[in-house]
Amino acid sequence: MNFIIPYYCDERLKYTQKYLKKAGYNEVFDKSEANFAVFAPACDKEMFKGYENVHVFYGVGDYDKKYKNCYDYNKRDDFKYKNAILTSEGAIALYKENSNKAIYGSNILITGFGKIGKSLCNVLKAMGSKLTICARSDIDKAQAKTIADNVIDFKALQCQNYDIIFNTVPAIYFTKNEIDTFKNDIKYIELASFPGGIDKHYAKIKNIDIIDGSKLPSRYSKISAGYLIGETIDKMIKEGKNWKSDIAWQAHFVHLAKQ
C-alpha cells in the first residue's frame, strides 16, 4: 500500500515515515499513486486541497466531519493516552529547564484530571512531590484520591501554598483573587489549549512567569511522537472499524490492508 507525506512541516513526520516504511508501506511522491496521505497533527485546511480522492490521516480539527476521506488519529483513545504520557514527560522536562528546585518535596497543584492530568499525577507522585489535584467530576475526584495527597474542587481553589502549578484545563480559573495569593517564585506551567487557565494580563502585571507547555511531544519526544502517529495509522488501516462510521469506507480500508 502506498502513502504520501506531502508536507514535512513537522519533524515528527520524519519518524512517522520511518515507522510506516518499516511496517511494510511504500512511500510515493505523486499523490495519484498514493492510497493514503499523512498530515501533521496541526494542519491548515488549505493543505487538503487536491487530496479529495486520497484518504487523508490528520490530527487536529473536525475535517473528518466535513470531508468523507479524512480520518483523525488524534480522536482515538489509545493515541490520546500514549500522547498524554509523552506530554507529561515533556512537562517535567520543561519545569526542570525553568527551575533549579527539585520536584521531590515540592507542593504541586494539577488542575484537571483528564488523560494528561492522570499521567502527570502518576509521574509526579512517584517523584516524591506533595500533590494536590483539582478536579470537577465525582468520578475524577474518587480516582484522584487513590493517588494524590489532597483533592479539591474548583470552587475551593486556593493557591497560596503551591510551588508549582500544572494547568490542563482550557478555562480561566486563575484570576486576580487566585494570582494575588501565588508565591513570588511560583512556576506556572500552561498545558491547556487556548485560552489557557490563567488571566495572562494580570499575571504579567504581577510578574508571574507563565511557562508555555504547548506541543510538548514534538518538542521533547519527536521520535516517539512520530512513531506513535505511524503506529496509530497502521492500526486504523488494519482494523477498518471503530474510527469511521461509514461502513463502506471501513470495508474499503479492510480491502486496502489486505493488498
What are these regions, as identified by a protein language model?
Residues C9, R136-S137, A192-F194:
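Residues in the short beta-alpha loop(s) of Rossmann-like NAD(P)-binding domains
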Residues N2, N26, E33, N107, ...:
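Residues at the starts of beta-strands that form the adenosine-phosphate
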Residues D30, M127-I147:
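NAD(P)-binding Rossmann-fold cofactor-contacting core
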Residues I4-K14, L20, Y104-L124:
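Glycine-rich adenosine-cofactor-binding loop
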Residues A42-N53, A144-R219:
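Rossmann-like adenosine-cofactor binding region
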Residues L20-A34, D44-M47, D153-K155:
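A short, well-structured beta->alpha microelement
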Residues F39-G50, V54-G105, G213, T232, ...:
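Glycine/serine-rich phosphate-binding loop and adjoining beta1-alpha1 elements at the start
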Residues F79, I211-Q259:
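C-terminal helix-to-coil terminal segments
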